[in-house]
C-alpha cells in the first residue's frame, strides 16, 4: 500500500468515525467500520477472482446479467469455483461497489435505500458458505452489525443516510 493510499484510508476512517461519534461508543462503531471494511475486502476479492475466470471470455463480472440463461450459467460456474477457492460467494449485484453506487444514486425514480439489501447480502455471504470447509470461518461474521439499531438513526431513512 502506497503512502497516498494509507493517507486516504486514514482520512476515510476518521470521516467515518466522526460521522458515528456521538451516536454510539467507540467499541460499537468499531464493529460497523470493521464489518464494512471486511465486506468491501470480500467483495473486491470476489470481483478480482471472477474477472480472472472470465478474462478468456472477455467479460467483466459486474456486466453479467443474472436474469438471462447465459448469465445464470456463468454465475453458477463462478459460484462453484469461488466456493472451492475463496470459501464464499457474492453475486455481481452484491458487490460493495454496486451497493455503494445504489446508495449514492441521485437518479430520479431509483431508490438509494440500501439497508435491506445490505442485511440480505451480509446474510448471503454467510449462507453461501454452508456445507463448505469455510462455514465455521464465516459463522456469525457480521452479527455485530445491527443495521436496524436506533443508534445509527431514529428512522430507517436516517440509518440509511449514515450507512
Residue map of PLM features:
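Non-catalytic, mostly N-terminal accessory regions of nucleic-acid modification and defense proteins
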Residues: 1-163
